[in-house]
Amino acid sequence: MESVAKLLAAGDPVYFTLQNMSEFRNVATRPVPNNGLGFSVALALGEMEKIERFLTILPDSPAVYGEWKRLVVQHSVLGSKVHDAKLVATMNVHGIRRILTFNTEDFTRYDIEAIHPLSLLS
């Protein structure tokens, strides 16, 4: 969250998508022994509402679907990597070129810049 705060303080726009929020809720409400945060429903909702207050949601649209389909075919995307392709499709449709992610290697196949959050803090 420090890296997001740094971007916001610098005046950089920071966005989220339904995909980001659903992945957050999945991890937030998953039990700790199962690699989750173990948040209650109420705590997860509170954190989601904080995100909504500070960041801008990028909407899904038929154009996002078309771009996602193009990407998964062009890059032969398989399995859970289709979720990364959906993020990139949303970015492409909305003209966004950079993504903040701990999994930078998952985005190397795409024509975007993947930035690790820790790189903004050094």
Each PLM stretch: what is its role?
Residues 47-65, 69, 75-76, 107-122:
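Short acidic, glycine/proline-enriched helix-loop-strand junctions
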Residues 31, 56-104:
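Active-site neighborhoods of divalent-metal-dependent phosphate/nucleic-acid chemistry enzymes
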Residues 17, 37, 57-61:
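Short, hydrophobic secondary-structure boundary micro-motifs
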